[in-house]
Amino acid sequence: MDNDRQKALDTVIKNMEKSFGKGAVMKLGDNKARKVSSVSSGSVTLDNALGVGGYPKGRIVEIYGPESSGKTTVALHAIAEVQKNGGVAAFIDAEHALDPVYAEALGVDIQNLYLSQPDHGEQGLEIAEAFVRSGAVDIVVVDSVAALTPKAEIEGEMGDTHVGLQARLMSQALRKLSGAISKSNTTAVFINQIREKVGVMFGNPEVTPGGRALKFYSSVRLEVRRAEQLKQGQEIVGNRTKIKVVKNKVAPPFRVAEVDIMYGKGISKEGELIDLGAEHEIVNKSGAWYSYNGERMGQGKENVKLYLKENPAIREEIDQKLREKLGIFDGDVEEKEAESPATLFDEEE
């Protein structure tokens, strides 16, 4: 570019920075923020599937799936990890159904968790926005989008129709929130439910409530589904759960993480260390016996889980070796966008 044109451009940029503040316009090569840092999901398997070592900071994440599939459990594990690293977490409980005893069992510091149980959707989203704009909160979880009922619907009569009201509410809220989330470096997690669209003859009839806006604004979308029941004898003690990365703007998508969610305990970290450790030859498996560094840990997965619980130093050592081998670390991955082809039909906005 010749000098006259460069001077004209520099003058325009200076004027813009005077009007809108420093950093309003920059060269992409100078933008350090294009590298994405992350917060751990609390699961090595899921961190690996997400590709950047966890949920990206300054981004929107949607977790959806059928009832009792483990959506809230997955979100609570992320809160526990943030708090463990000295961060601040907020939980917008629109469903009014958070179990503090269960949250504490998952490792959440309930004494220092900021909780809001809003009366209507507008209030819940305004509280979420206030937390984000403060710049002091590391993660905000909204549980759930389907429960963010517009004020007009709550104050109306039973049977009144409110076509597209919730979708418009979400669309407006996300337009306001997205910029603030990016600037504050807050991770915003929206939990969503699933509905079935009437009259769909071909394809998937499942839809997520709240319109299309959340799908567009989300950098990561996770689909959580139960795969099978886990039993000890005749007693059902948990579920094998599949978490599919349906959309990922910060790493390759379509990866699947399989975890054991145990009733009352959450994701079994010992279970995933055994599975991943054996797969990557950090843990040796011979028949039903598992060993580490030549020392036998036990026969059968449940016995080895118990061994790892009783030996936290060995558990942490295996965890560290796995993270090094899988290259799980904070951020520094450039954006790549791709999404699973139309896994969900959309509600009308």
From Swiss-Prot:
GO terms for molecular function: ATP binding; ATP hydrolysis activity; ATP-dependent DNA damage sensor activity; damaged DNA binding; single-stranded DNA binding. The lineage of its organism: Bacteria, Bacillati, Bacillota, Bacilli, Bacillales. Its main location: cytoplasm. GO terms for cellular component: cytosol. Belongs to the RecA family. GO terms for biological process: DNA recombination; DNA repair; SOS response. This is Protein RecA. CDD domains: RecA.
